[in-house]
Design a protein with these regions (language model features):
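Predominantly extracellular/luminal regions of secreted and cell-surface proteins
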Residues: 14-50
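Short beta-strand segments within Ig-like beta-sandwich modules, predominantly Fibronectin type-III
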Residues: 115-117
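Aromatic, loop-rich ligand-recognition surfaces of beta-strand-rich domains
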Residues: 1-21, 52-111, 120-169
Length: 169
């Protein structure tokens, strides 16, 4: 199954309904730097920006919690939306507790999305209200929780895709 979502669509007489992205895909093919090494069986961190978010796609899994994944954008950009696709294991319902931050210099970060109280499972559609420009984005994963019993579920960890949409400056 694919995990694409489009907030807007347009109708074209010849082609029918056309999905409209919330800006340019700013993260496609970018390098990802993890705070900790991948776990055994994990794909390389760059898999989260390869454009592939299918259940059969490679995913990043850390060997340490909490962990961070930092992405350097090709140029400073205004971020309009972030899509985060997380792994689901045989119907397990796990919620990620996370933040997403932005920075111009890679040193001082501003929180763009606070998902530490999130109970969303699987695919996250995250509008970004902050209109500042950012060169770096960082996903901080604090916990992965089984939503049925509130127990840690790091065994189900896996980030398929992190896609930031927006407008380069």
């Amino acid at each position: 199954a694919s995990m694409n979502y489009f907030r807007f669509v347009e109708f074209h007489d010849q082609y029918g309904i056309i999905p409209v992205q919330n800006g340019r895909n700013l993260t496609l093919g970018t390098t990802v730097v993890p705070s900790h090494a991948p776990d055994d069986g994990s794909a390389a961190p760059d898999c989260i920006t390869d454009g592939s978010d299918m259940a059969s796609s490679p995913y990043f899994k850390s060997n340490h919690y909490p962990y961070s994944l930092t992405i350097e954008l090709p140029q400073p950009s205004r971020i309009s939306e972030i899509n985060l696709a997380t792994r689901l294991v045989n119907g397990s319902e796990t919620a990620y507790k996370y933040t997403i931050e932005g920075s111009m210099d890679g040193q001082e970060y501003q929180t763009l999305i606070d998902g530490r109280n999130s109970w969303i499972v699987g695919f996250h559609i995250l509008p970004v209200e902050d209109r500042s420009a950012y060169k770096f984005l960082r996903l901080n994963v604090f916990q992965i929780i089984n939503v049925h019993n509130n127990h840690p579920a790091t065994w189900a960890d896996g980030i398929y895709e992190f896609t930031a949409f927006g407008f380069p400056l």
